[in-house]
Design a protein with these regions (language model features):
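Short beta-strand-to-loop acidic/aromatic patch adjacent to the donor-nucleotide binding site
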Residues: 57-68
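A short, glycine-/small-residue-rich helix N-cap motif at loop->alpha-helix starts
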Residues: 38-44, 171
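A short acidic, amphipathic alpha-helical/loop segment
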Residues: 23-24, 46-47, 73-77
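C-terminal catalytic/acceptor-binding lobe
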Residues: 147-148, 157-158, 162-222
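N-proximal low-complexity "stem/linker" segments adjacent to membrane-targeting elements
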Residues: 1-35
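Short, high-confidence coil segments that cap the C-terminus of an alpha-helix
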Residues: 56-57, 83-86, 186
Length: 222
């Protein structure tokens, strides 16, 4: 029987209940691992363990439940992931407020340690800057970045084996991942064709269900 050379596992971190996200993810036909209602500092190491014991999968795909994406977005990154150890899409930073003008991409490493920092300590690029870069080089949409906020990030198995998911005071896994990749000499890339919608609202705190609903790990083969 024919088996695809690239076999990603979409790892979904779901601390909320978001119908818009659930509708989007249902349209992507891929094996999924749901990490439901765990705090971040437990969710990521647990997901790493679950992925590593499933040796048939080639890539760990980070997907958070506040990111709206399409099957096209997923397929573009899947088509490129064998060429890069780490490749992601990108999105707006917030959806409302001052930071809605900014992207998830930074051309500098995040503050370290990140736990006591604020968004003002990051150096996120404006969306218009990223759009200009894309339009200036339409034939070269993939760029190297120090940090991109884990926007549907494809990590090769060898990267997941080498790099643990660390946290600082229970948060900031994405920031520390960027530092750990940098320190290990592993480059990460963003495909500018894959722009998604980040549902991060300035005026409303997230309706987290961590501690309110039972946590669970659910494997969902397609």
């Amino acid at each position: 029987m024919y088996q695809e050379r690239t076999r990603p596992l979409l790892v979904i971190f779901q601390p909320r209940y978001n119908e818009r996200f659930l509708d989007a993810v249902s349209k992507v036909k891929v094996d999924k691992l749901w990490i439901n209602y765990y705090p971040q500092h437990i969710a990521y190491p647990l997901a790493r363990i679950e992925f590593l014991k499933r040796e048939e999968y080639t890539h760990f795909v980070i997907m958070t439940d506040d990111l709206i994406f399409t099957n096209r977005d997923y397929q573009i990154l899947k088509g490129e992931c064998e060429k890069y150890d780490v490749i992601s899409g990108w999105a707006n930073n917030w959806i409302t407020g001052y930071w809605a003008e900014y992207s998830s991409i930074s051309f500098k490493l995040p503050p370290n340690p990140p736990g006591q920092s604020t968004i003002y300590d990051y150096d996120f690029a404006k969306i218009i800057t990223i759009q200009v870069m894309k339009e200036a080089n339409p034939d070269k949409p993939i760029i190297e970045v120090p940090h991109q906020g884990t926007m549907m990030t494809f990590l090769s198995r060898k990267v997941v084996e080498k790099i643990p998911f660390r946290h600082d005071c229970g948060c900031c896994v994405d920031a520390l991942l960027s530092h750990d990749l940098h320190n290990a000499g592993i480059k990460q890339y963003v495909d500018l064709r894959v722009r998604m919608l980040h549902l991060k609202y300035a005026e409303l705190p997230p309706d987290l269900l961590v501690g309110k609903k039972p946590s669970s790990v659910v494997f969902e083969p397609q």
